[in-house]
């Protein structure tokens, strides 16, 4: 970064405090979910450190892999393992939540279908062909990877993300259903 030295020292101090506070939170907090979020703060602070060192790709990989995958995996595994709390209104609150989720997901699905149907794919293909002229201008590998992911491999990339989302929702649903069948009647 081309900033004055005093500003760089201030930014590094803030990043170091984020790493220190996040690490202390991981160790000292009793709730495992709060510890997981503290771990996320630590990972984000480390990625900011990489940004200061002009390692943009490493910073992006840090955020995507550690914060986006590992930290989310920890939070979901904790949510799946914890026993549900005793609640008398569990069935009504669950039905209300299911209905709200159904409405939101159905409206999102219909919105996406309408966008897909209204998109003129032939124009997108012609734009893609016209951008081939500018391909030699790209200098770094990060720019080439980003260009390929957003042009040639856009549809497989998005389909893979939807597939992972469906697998995650299915795993959560299966875990909740198996937990409901395994609990004795006095705990429900």
Swiss-Prot record:
The family database entries (Pfam families) matched by this protein are listed as: Oxidored_q3 (PF00499)
Segments passing through the bilayer? 10-30, 32-52, 61-81, 97-117, 153-173
A single cellular component GO annotation:
chloroplast thylakoid membrane
Q: Is the keyword Amino-acid biosynthesis assigned to this protein?
A: no
Q: What is its EC number?
A: 7.1.1.-
The name this protein carries in UniProt is NAD(P)H-quinone oxidoreductase subunit 6, chloroplastic
The job of this chain, per UniProt, is described as: NDH shuttles electrons from NAD(P)H:plastoquinone, via FMN and iron-sulfur (Fe-S) centers, to quinones in the photosynthetic chain and possibly in a chloroplast respiratory chain. The immediate electron acceptor for the enzyme in this species is believed to be plastoquinone. Couples the redox reaction to proton translocation, and thus conserves the redox energy in a proton gradient.
């Amino acid at each position: 970064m081309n900033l004055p030295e005093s500003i760089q020292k201030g930014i590094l101090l803030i990043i170091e405090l984020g790493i220190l506070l996040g690490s202390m939170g991981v160790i000292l907090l009793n709730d495992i979910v709060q510890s997981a979020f503290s771990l996320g703060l630590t990972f984000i602070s480390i990625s900011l450190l990489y940004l200061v060192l002009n390692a943009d790709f490493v910073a992006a990989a840090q955020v995507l892999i550690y914060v986006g995958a590992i930290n989310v995996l920890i939070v979901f595994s904790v949510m799946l393992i914890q026993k549900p709390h005793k609640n008398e209104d569990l069935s009504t609150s669950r039905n209300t939540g299911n209905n709200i989720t159904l409405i939101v997901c159905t409206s999102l699905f219909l919105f996406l279908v309408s966008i897909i149907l209204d998109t003129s794919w032939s124009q997108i293909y012609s734009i893609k062909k016209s951008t081939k002229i500018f391909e030699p201008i790209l200098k770094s590998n990060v720019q080439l990877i980003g260009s390929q992911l957003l042009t040639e491999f856009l549809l497989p990339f998005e389909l893979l993300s939807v597939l992972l989302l469906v697998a995650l929702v299915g795993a959560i649903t299966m875990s909740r259903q198996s937990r409901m069948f395994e609990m004795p009647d006095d705990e429900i």
